[in-house]
C-alpha cells in the first residue's frame, strides 16, 4: 500500500511541475490530438464489431 502511495506522490509532483510551468499548454494540445485519434480508432472498431455481429446473425 505504501508503494502505491509513493508512486502516486511522484506522479502528482510531476503533474504539478508540468501544471505550473509553461509545458502544460503544449502537452494539452498533444493530449487533445491523441484523444481525437483514440476516439476515431474506437469508432472504427465499434462499427467493425457491429458489422461482424450482423454477419454472424
Swiss-Prot record:
<dbReference type="InterPro" id="IPR009760">
    <property type="entry name" value="DUF1328"/>
</dbReference>
<dbReference type="Pfam" id="PF07043">
    <property type="entry name" value="DUF1328"/>
</dbReference>
<comment type="similarity">
    <text>Belongs to the UPF0391 family.</text>
</comment>
<dbReference type="GO" id="GO:0005886">
    <property type="term" value="C:plasma membrane"/>
</dbReference>
<feature type="transmembrane region" description="Helical">
    <location>
        <begin position="33"/>
        <end position="53"/>
    </location>
</feature>
<protein>
    <recommendedName>
        <fullName>UPF0391 membrane protein RL4195</fullName>
    </recommendedName>
</protein>
<keyword id="KW-0812">Transmembrane</keyword>
<keyword id="KW-1133">Transmembrane helix</keyword>
<keyword id="KW-1003">Cell membrane</keyword>
<feature type="transmembrane region" description="Helical">
    <location>
        <begin position="4"/>
        <end position="24"/>
    </location>
</feature>
<keyword id="KW-0472">Membrane</keyword>
